[in-house]
């Protein structure tokens, strides 16, 4: 992965984290990695554990950022989330899967557009977008 792409991803995650914090989420983990996959952010909203996939793009030329959360990626996140819940003794906790789409485009590049998609997919990995 090129350095510009890594930079875009890191900026997207920073913007997503700031957005979530400003909207009452409490960040528990960042870049949680398991043999089953990685989860960008794990947060609490109230008493719900929220697993967040962050997607960032420099433009909408190839579609909105959330369109790149494939079924395969969703399944990886669900598996990694299950492992997290098990490891943390939270197997009975309410949880959901959100996507934060961040677009750095044109004059707004310094102030990206952030879109939160709550309940973006379920444990079966079925996208709603």
Language-model segments: what does each one mean?
Residues 56-105:
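Catalytic cores of nucleic-acid endonucleases
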Residues 87-129:
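Domain-level recognition of nuclease-like catalytic cores that cleave nucleotide substrates
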Residues 35-37:
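Short acidic/glycine-enriched loop/turn segments that link adjacent beta-strands
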